Amino acid sequence: MASGIRAEDEAAFEAFLALSREIGGDILKTQGAGGNTSFKRDGVMWVKASGTWLAHAGEQDIMVPVEVAPLVAALRARDPSAEKATDFVVTALNASGLRPSIETSFHAVLPQTVVAHYHCVNAIALSVLAGREQILAERMAALPDLAWATVPYRRPGTPLAYEIDRVAANRPDVLILYNHGIIVAGETVEEVRTRIACVTAALSVDERATVSGNAAHLQTLIEGAPFHVAEDAGSHKTALHPANIAVATGGSLYPDHVIFLGTEIGVLGAGESVTAYAQTRGARGLDMPKMLLV
């Protein structure tokens, strides 16, 4: 339990940590250290700290307390201190010396008590499509009781917070961030959990059918080369359909695309060995891509 949480709020805060852990444990919502959640009480907001994982909520100290009002004022005044939000940490309650997430400022401008931001794979997939406005409107029409809006892509940090601040006063229940992810907000943990379930169902996308990969053959191909066969079966689908390959190699679509895979995904040429591919890259002074499609 975080220090500074009133006894009467302990159950709600524990529920918040449990929700954070659930979101962090779902690969279709959170990948690695991505995403963040927040809980506001008495002018203080507990938000996921930089570099921590939602999946560790409740097991490790990952929430850092910040003062909401001065942070919001700084953001609206275009004060550079709003970017990292470290000046607004409640030091007396920050026993682990954690630093706020770079996205702390947008959590602060949203008035709801509980806010969950995560990198929903399906929300991202729909938000990068041509005609995304109509596609999303048709999907969200299934949830007429939820107020929702879209937010254009902006760099995480104050640029994104400025855009969210434009719509925050309308108290949106759901914000779909183009090329980034989703935000779900509410007054209670259970309200947010229910909304997440509803939005997840509404935005669900069927996977494109592909043939099966051959891990044994891939293992033979990479012998002597600086690559390993992906352990996740789903990852192989990227290479098993022409449309998937076109999307994967067509450029970066969202921040985590670059964080996890870099700016380039390699494709093995017809008749080319993996070893020859690696040697050619090395001879040209090029870094090895983090993913090679065969």
Q: Regions from the language model: what does each represent?
A:
Residues 1-294:
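Glycine-rich flexible loops
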